[in-house]
Amino acid sequence: MKTVSEIAEIKELVYQWKSKDRSIGLVPTMGFLHAGHGSLIEKARAENDVVIVSNFVNPTQFSANEDLNSYPRNLEADCKLCESLGVDLMFTPTPEGMYDNPLTFVDINLLSDELCGKSRPTHFRGVCTVVTKLFNITKPTKAYFGQKDAQQLIIIKKMTRDLNFDIEIIGCPIVREKDGLAMSSRNAYLNPEERKAATCLSKSIALGESIIKKGLPARELKDRMKKIIEDEPLARMDYLEIVDLNTLQPVKCLNDSVLVAMAVHFGKTRLIDNFIYEI
């Protein structure tokens, strides 16, 4: 596996691969990789001639009061995992290399205003900007994103269509710990009590998945799921919403495919989880 930090160097490698008609799979990450990332890499490895993993804690998707400086990092462990999974290239750009006094950003209306966008108003502008840059730099055939960040996945699919990127966006299932907690790099922030309390998210998800087919009104489904979170003393709700899978607008009736998504704080750590119900 090769590790590259310079944009010019990776663009030259991409040019060589493209000239040989090799397909490229891109797995964008912020590092501190876990088995959830591993599942994306494995799928990319199975479907492409070349696999690139980007490892970049993107400053433009963090607000001033968020955890940019404390976000967990372990490049050595990340390299070992990627090498073991057959990654061809890890791209590790610097903030200065990716953002040289930028005046241009990529934003998406409406979709970025809902759910996480309400409490993180500039987050998805940063996500869309860095993903656009990664697409332009690596020119992937396919790009792989996890369903845990469902709003991000929906936004990136829409952005890719709107900007006419000739890239297939692949969404991959949530990978969970043995006790159900969705794998996340931010789980490392949790102390033992918070870690135990955080399982209320997956318990709420499991309840929702089990009863949604009964045809309950969205309000009743939402209330029953919220109660599980609210009964946990260490949990502080940001949101729990049932929204249309395409527009991310709240729904009252479960007549179309929906995303059931939540964000909950445990101490200083904010975790998200979701499930999709398709009709």
Regions found by a protein language model. Name each.
Residues 219, 224-279:
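Phosphate/ribose-recognition catalytic cores of enzymes acting on nucleotide-derived substrates
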Residues 2-234, 243, 247:
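Nucleotidyltransferase catalytic core that binds NTPs
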